């Protein structure tokens, strides 16, 4: 591992600046899902146990360098206090300057301080060295626990990390270890499942994966584009016909790299995209001209079952069908439950990420069974694309 963790740092009596992700959904000024807040608790508690004083830095929404009251982190304070019962959590109405400096000076051991939205300063998203230096003045150690913001080179994620002794927080550490196990030095064979609507949004991902995995399963709307590239008609299905040449390039790149690509063998088609729509299962080559492909069929699921059973590592990003609408969630559900089963039996290391993916695995009741579920979205995708993440690179020893 090329980065320090909390275990490597002497925090006793030190002010620890912790970059966290508390970008939670709100309704009428109330937090509707506190998952991201709950995930930072182990890091905050470990810093407190080591005698450090945690000062939390975070962004909230997109205020574009201006103060926007509805995007004040003050709104998150009650949910944060609830997640840390028995710990006094205070708030400072800025993240640099006299107000946070005084609030930090007044902190007692065992207390936590939340600073105002870093994006209220235009310099945050520009990675302004002056803003990073003003933040660095507040503490002696920097901890990044926001993997989800690590793909952005901002003042609080990258600039600050280069000015103070730095380490990964517990959530960041867990994420990096899981991704290292899945793509860095994985146990082989490695299977990647990539679904979703469009090839165009996942070009870099597919291009990187064919050179790094043994099997690539392509599902969802993007599978239709690959079928079109092979001369198969897909009726009224979602397909990016202008991406057919690109799909053929990916297929030949995979062949050259010894990566087997798995496309649907049979498909579930319907004439309407709605819950409970009349549907039928047909061979992939037999999609009626007036129908659309909305899921992979049982033959495909059975074939994938064999691929999964032979694998040691699996990475999943994107559903295999239109999982939001029953019965077109069947292939995603069946595949996800099998991965969870193999993982629980100790036969597979499974890592999944991306918004739709997490929703699909939760819907299938399979999320708990995976080795690791990343909530990072864009950062998870960029890591899978093989890109260097500035927030992680800045922590590298």
UniProtKB/Swiss-Prot annotation:
Gene3D superfamilies: Phosphoglycerate kinase, N-terminal domain. The keyword Cell membrane does not apply. One of its GO terms (molecular function) is ATP binding. It is an enzyme of class 2 (transferase). Pfam families: PGK (PF00162). Belongs to the phosphoglycerate kinase family. This is Phosphoglycerate kinase.
